[in-house]
Curated annotation (Swiss-Prot):
The lineage of its organism: Eukaryota, Fungi, Dikarya, Ascomycota, Saccharomycotina. One of its GO terms (molecular function) is ubiquitin-ubiquitin ligase activity. The modification Phosphoserine is found at S111, S350. Residues 18-30 have a biased composition (Low complexity). GO terms for cellular component: ubiquitin ligase complex. Transmembrane segments: none annotated. Residues 1-42 are annotated as: Disordered. GO terms for biological process: protein monoubiquitination; protein polyubiquitination; regulation of translation. InterPro entries: Bul1-like, Bul1_N. Open reading frame exhibits genomic organization compatible with a translational readthrough-dependent mode of expression. It comes from the Eukaryota. Belongs to the BUL1 family. It comes from Saccharomyces cerevisiae (strain ATCC 204508 / S288c) (Baker's yeast). This is Bypass of stop codon protein 5.
Length: 489
């Protein structure tokens, strides 16, 4: 990765002080802007002009994008995203995360069992009198009120995040937009938006970014921002009470780097871009740690999702493998009856589809869905407190529908039949190679010249066709999908 020596934006009198510590995503940082005289260094990646925002030198990305395969810990997900506390979020997530600092001792010689330097966890510049220290293996860790603020809130009765759609919705001047791009978006560069007709398949990577803007003249406090890739199935049944619609959520993937967290790194480059201003779309990177959107403040963050090959094993309680495969998109996710464009929505015979003009709307295809629906979408949701009632509610939400056709023409579904065939083909290939080697050695021992035809003849798989059918599937009683492969004797 190379770094450009010319800043794309120049700014006046702005300087950033940051402190970061390594995390699962590469770094967690909090920062404090300071305006004053610039003490320029060539490596600072900051410059100044008449603007009021900060900018960084944009790193040049490699053309080949590699999605990190590092998964966050279950503990991190449980503490940050699995529950929605009904009390104040500030109790559990202070504005600045704790950071580690090496504290020196006054003693010149450390005592036995103690190290010369202590690692101390701090949440501010001063360790108050209420804080105390715990020594573990010669290392001291400061704890106190600040540590209790980031404790697990298992004892707090929270709302499971799966019930987020059941929360009451209120109208706020927060505008949320979602954009899907052809490649990984880059800071300071104009993105190339993906076509609405794009179909994704298993293993494909979805790139994009979102923007959140406060369009009012007053600061707005929010509690949490979630960015997910979700899949739902819906069906309609006739009952004595009318038509009932049943919806089940079959897939839920959370981008923890794009959702609100203390992390402000671009996952594509590993750069800490917190607070940097992008003149391309007039946005600042990252969501503020204070969770307060100032008037006119427009924020953005990048997201990345990888389409899975199958759902979780617990999707089918009977353990049928075929039931855990990712179903394809089916049907039309019709908007609510209050949508202004619903009355003018028409199916185009020439194009073969119909859709609303809104970005991210579902495609209406002639797929004979008969009221059934399988829909995949990227969802952005902002949760906060209603000022009037004090209850947790949805302050803003946005959905971007995507089409998924798993196991495209170049990818075959994983099945037991394919496993059997792969093993048999592998046996044939090994036998072919061994036969070729034996024939070559035999001719060498008899001093017979080796010709190209000898190798080609040994490579013919039809000579070894009796090898097929050497494996059989031992299915579990009552379940043909689960079992083991057994080699025939």
């Amino acid at each position: 990765m190379q770094e450009s020596k010319e800043p794309q934006n120049k700014f006046e009198g702005c300087q950033r002080i940051s402190s970061s510590s390594s995390t699962l995503f590469g770094g967690t940082s909090f920062e404090e802007p300071r305006c004053g005289t610039s003490q320029g260094k060539e490596e600072d990646a900051f410059a100044c002009n008449n603007g009021d925002h900060c900018s960084s030198i944009t790193n040049v990305q490699e053309d080949d994008f590699v999605l990190p395969e590092l998964l966050p810990s279950f503990e991190m997900y449980e503490n940050l995203l699995s529950n929605i506390p009904q009390s104040s979020f500030d109790t559990y997530f202070p504005e600045n995360p704790p950071f580690y600092e090496v504290a020196s001792r006054n003693q010149s010689i450390p005592s036995e069992g103690e190290s010369g330097n202590d690692m101390r966890i701090l949440t501010g510049d001063i360790v108050g009198p209420d804080n105390h220290e715990v020594t573990v293996d010669g290392r001291r860790f400061a704890s106190g009120p600040a540590e209790s603020q980031i404790r697990n809130y298992d004892d707090t009765k929270g709302i499971p995040v799966e019930n987020i759609y059941a929360l009451p919705r209120i109208k706020t001047p927060i505008a949320t937009e979602l954009y899907v791009t052809k490649t990984a978006p880059k800071f300071g560069q104009l993105p190339k938006h993906e076509s609405m007709l794009r179909e994704y398949t298993s293993g494909d990577i979805i790139h994009g970014y979102f923007t959140v803007e406060n369009k009012s003249t007053k600061p707005i406090k929010f509690d949490m921002f979630y960015l997910t890739l979700e899949g739902t199935t819906s069906s309609k049944t006739q009952s004595p009470f009318g038509i009932q619609k049943t919806t089940e959520r079959i897939l839920r993937m959370v981008d923890m780097a794009a959702s609100w967290s203390y992390n402000h790194e671009d996952v594509n480059t590993g750069e800490d871009l917190c607070g940097f201003f992008d003149s391309i779309d007039k946005t600042s990177f990252g969501l503020p740690n204070s969770r307060i959107l100032n008037p006119g403040d427009k924020r953005k963050k990048f997201f990345t999702f990888k389409i899975p090959n199958q759902l979780l094993d617990v999707t089918c309680k009977h353990g049928h493998f075929s039931h855990s495969l990712l179903p394809p998109t089916l049907g039309f996710d019709r908007p609510s009856s209050s949508h202004p464009e619903l009355s003018t929505l028409k199916f185009s015979e020439s194009l073969g589809y119909g859709r609303l003009s809104e970005r991210g709307s579902s495609l209406w295809l002639n797929d004979s869905s008969s009221g059934s629906l399988i829909n995949y979408s990227i969802n952005a949701m902002i949760v906060g407190k209603d000022v009037a009632s004090g209850r947790v509610c949805l302050m803003s939400e946005k959905k971007y529908s995507i089409r998924i056709v798993p196991f495209g023409f170049q990818n075959n579904p994983i099945s037991r039949e394919k496993c059997l065939k792969d093993l048999e083909d592998f046996d044939i290939e090994i036998a072919n190679r061994l036969g070729m080697i034996e024939k070559v050695f035999s001719k060498i021992e008899r001093a017979i010249p080796i010709h190209k035809e000898d190798i080609q003849e040994a490579n013919r798989s039809d000579q070894l066709s009796p090898l097929r059918g050497k494996y059989e599937w031992n299915a579990v009683a009552g379940n043909t999908e689960n079992g083991t492969l057994k080699k025939k004797h």
